[in-house]
Amino acid sequence: MNNYLEKFEKMRVAGNLAARTLDMLTENIKPGITTDYVDKLGYEFIRDHGGYSAPLYYRGFKKSLCTSLNHVVCHGIPSDRVLSEGDTINVDVTAVVDKHYGDTSRMFCLGETSVKVNNLIDATYESMMKAIKILKPGLKLGDIGYEIQSFIEKKGFSVVRDFCGHGISTTFHEPPNVLHYGRKDSGMELKPGMTFTIEPMINAGKWDIKMLNDGWTAVTKDKSLSAQFEHTLGITENGYEIFTESVKGYTKPPYL
């Protein structure tokens, strides 16, 4: 009997709340609001639907979600920064329900963006989905990284090396690390019941990053734009399940 079915059921609930939070934010993110307001909306939605926001007070983080604008790679801290026409922003949400975690992120474009920006965002989303679609028992973690890296580098972009996907279930971050670059047929073998994130961070320029003095915010070293998408997934007997799919069918910009 599949002893992970109960875990998967709880992961579905947490993942669904995280996805619905992003769906709500998709309909509210626009020029003129602050990233603090985005954080407030996310916090209240998760709270009002029976969960709590995992990032809040995690290792001293003081906000409920991450808002990473333009050349910020990840872990941007919500602030009084006002969103403007032409900005791109990644919003990363992690909801906890019944001690299980659902972690997902999505890119947003404010107003008109250039062809290069759109190509970067499209490639980032497509690289994540290409990796997801090959998931099944017996696959190796290196196959995931290879799928993303080979696709992205053909597009002329680069894969961030300093951050990766991770195991997730009743803990926010747990083994294994899921690298977004790698060699085919290398690393840990996937088995039914495993749950983890795939969350490629892709830069328009070089992959090098630097950390800001706040200890959280990672930015591209060359100030090129960065993009990211993320899903929480489980390995089934024959393939995979995405726990954080949009309820409203929002995948990548433009959403509305």
Enumerate the predicted regions with their spans.
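Active-site neighborhoods and metal-handling regions in enzymes and metal-associated proteins
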Residues: 1-256
